[in-house]
Amino acid sequence: MAKEGAIEVEGRIVEPLPNAMFRVELDNGHKVLAHISGKMRQHYIRILPEDRVVVELSPYDLTRGRIVYRYK
């Protein structure tokens, strides 16, 4: 369910940062800075270190992303 042109990749939360930002290590080894999507904030979905997540990356800036799903 990625936006038009967005890239969806899986990763693992490495560390929480201020302002609902997270450092995420992708499965390919890269580390990106990601924030929580609006729907996840609305539904109070908590994200903890070591959680597996799906991150949506923009093709314009591959170092930043949006967390769109947390695996149970």
Swiss-Prot record:
It comes from the Bacteria. The gene is infA. InterPro entries: NA-bd_OB-fold, RNA-binding_domain_S1_IF1, S1_domain, TIF_IF1. GO terms for molecular function: ribosome binding; rRNA binding; translation initiation factor activity. GO terms for cellular component: cytosol. This is Translation initiation factor IF-1. Component of the 30S ribosomal translation pre-initiation complex which assembles on the 30S ribosome in the order IF-2 and IF-3, IF-1 and N-formylmethionyl-tRNA(fMet); mRNA recruitment can occur at any time during PIC assembly. PROSITE patterns: S1_IF1_TYPE. Belongs to the IF-1 family. The keyword Protein biosynthesis applies. It is found in: Cytoplasm. One of the essential components for the initiation of protein synthesis. Stabilizes the binding of IF-2 and IF-3 on the 30S subunit to which N-formylmethionyl-tRNA(fMet) subsequently binds. Helps modulate mRNA selection, yielding the 30S pre-initiation complex (PIC). Upon addition of the 50S ribosomal subunit IF-1, IF-2 and IF-3 are released leaving the mature 70S translation initiation complex. SUPFAM superfamilies: Nucleic acid-binding proteins (SSF50249). Residues 1-72 form the S1-like domain. Keywords: Cytoplasm, Initiation factor, Protein biosynthesis, RNA-binding, rRNA-binding. The keyword Cell inner membrane does not apply.
